[in-house]
């Protein structure tokens, strides 16, 4: 695989390494004698949990997202540039944003985010939500298969009495805390109604993975 890219680029590949801990896709940082870039491949399963099936072409949905946001200088400046794509093998070639840290630290008790960073993150989501209307596109991104996967894990799986997940391994005592929520039928009916909305086609463009792990603090500022 490295030899293929070396011939294709007419450059010397110096190294290939994982840029971080990802869940969904197989990702590499490729360093050459001239630059570095990111390769991301989506396969027919969740990379971190191979037993979980996932839409194989999800990287191409992501590529379509990158193409659309190029019409917004504000949004495209906050995200890596899409350099190229291989639709046959579901591979994206992306700009390398460099070494940085994400905001997953916010899940730790006592950790915070400063007001300016929070405003940037909120502004990005608000701009994205208002900048595009599906009615203006011949083929708007629907990505229904990926939404079905997320729907199962957000609106169904957590509320099953026995879902095979040992919550106490995540945090001691969490199983007992979660039990009342799993037994609350009113809550579950409200969650189910939200799930129906989630699966419905809307008119706005959404980022499908907008959470602290996708917010990066880099030398160029916050990137998504």
For each feature predicted by the language model, list its residue ranges.
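Active-site acidic catalytic loop and adjacent metal/ATP-binding pocket
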Residues: 17-32, 38-39, 189-224
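ATP-binding pocket architecture of kinase catalytic cores
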Residues: 19, 29-140
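Short flexible/disordered coil segments
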Residues: 99, 137-161, 196-217
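Active-site catalytic-loop/activation-segment of kinase and kinase-like phosphoryl-transfer enzymes
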Residues: 141-194
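Short, conserved clusters of charged catalytic residues that mark active-site
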Residues: 11, 22, 61, 77, ...
């Amino acid at each position: 695989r490295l030899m293929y890219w070396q011939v294709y680029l007419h450059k010397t590949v110096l190294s290939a390494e994982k840029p971080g801990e990802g869940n969904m896709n197989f990702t590499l940082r490729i360093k050459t004698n001239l630059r570095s870039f990111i390769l991301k491949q989506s396969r027919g399963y969740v990379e971190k949990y191979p037993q979980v099936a996932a839409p194989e072409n999800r990287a191409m949905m992501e590529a379509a997202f990158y193409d659309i946001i190029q019409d917004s200088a504000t949004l495209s400046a906050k995200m890596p540039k899409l350099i190229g794509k291989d639709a046959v093998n579901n591979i994206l070639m992306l700009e390398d944003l460099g070494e940085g840290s994400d905001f997953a630290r916010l899940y730790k008790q006592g950790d915070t985010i400063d007001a300016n960073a929070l405003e940037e993150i909120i502004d990005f989501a608000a701009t994205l939500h208002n900048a595009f209307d599906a009615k203006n596109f011949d083929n708007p991104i629907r990505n229904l298969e990926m939404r079905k996967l997320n729907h199962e894990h957000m609106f169904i799986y957590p509320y099953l009495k026995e879902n095979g997940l040992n919550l106490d391994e995540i945090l001691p005592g969490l199983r007992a805390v979660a039990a009342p929520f799993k037994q609350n039928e009113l809550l579950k009916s409200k969650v189910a109604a939200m799930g129906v909305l989630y699966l419905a086609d809307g008119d706005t463009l959404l980022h499908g993975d907008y959470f602290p792990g996708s917010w990066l603090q880099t030398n160029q500022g916050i990137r998504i």
